[in-house]
Regions:
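Second-shell loop/turn segments in exported
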Residues: 1, 17-29, 35-38, 64, ...
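Sec-exported extracytoplasmic/periplasmic mature domains
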Residues: 8, 40-44, 53, 57, ...
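Extracytoplasmic/secreted envelope proteins and their assembly/folding machinery
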Residues: 29-36, 96-103, 132, 148-151, ...
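Active-site microenvironments of hydrolase-like enzyme catalytic domains
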Residues: 34, 38-83
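Active-site-adjacent mobile loop/cap segments within catalytic or ligand-binding domains
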Residues: 114-164
Length: 164
């Protein structure tokens, strides 16, 4: 479902490899290999987004939504990794600034679309670029339509924040 949600954005290069098979353990190591290969193949890449949904209440009904116009939209949360876990990550502040820029524009255009940014001690492969983040689109209880609706608004926010 993350691939379907991601396809709703205007993405030039997308890697839809499942890295949590055969187990979630080691998925970030496997995805780092893909990211590095993708960056070599696409050296002009400026933004790296690791698209997730919030797993809080796995299998539960937690569904953070906001109503924008006539649409019920899954809320979006950035997760920013740091070097707090001991791994080198000199770009985390730049990644945080990028997320803040997007969230501020989102709050201006569509109040409630974004949840507060979560900053964590793990680096989540975000050391690969100056605009590398995890974006959690909704949670386990959100419907696919709510998540797809978020992408429509997120695309507009990113266009306004980054291209104007």
């Amino acid at each position: 479902s993350a691939c379907l949600v991601g396809s709703e954005m205007c993405i030039r290069d997308s890697d839809e490899t499942y890295h949590d098979y055969p187990a979630y353990s080691g998925s970030y190591n496997r995805s780092l290999t893909s990211i590095k290969n993708d960056l070599v193949a696409n050296p002009n890449t400026q933004i790296v987004i690791d698209l997730h949904r919030d797993a809080v209440g796995e299998g539960g009904t937690y569904a953070p939504t906001v109503k924008i116009g006539d649409d019920y939209v899954a809320q979006i949360m950035f997760v920013i990794g740091t070097d707090g876990g001991g791994l080198t990550h000199s770009q985390w502040v730049q990644n945080l600034k990028y997320a803040i820029k997007i969230v501020e524009k989102g709050n201006e255009l569509y109040p409630g679309l974004f949840k507060p940014i979560m900053v964590r001690n793990s680096r989540y492969n975000q050391h690969v670029a100056k605009a590398a983040t995890i974006m959690e689109i909704g949670a386990t209880g959100n419907t696919m339509d709510q998540c797809l609706n978020s992408m429509k608004y997120l695309s507009k926010v990113m266009d306004e924040a980054l291209n104007k």
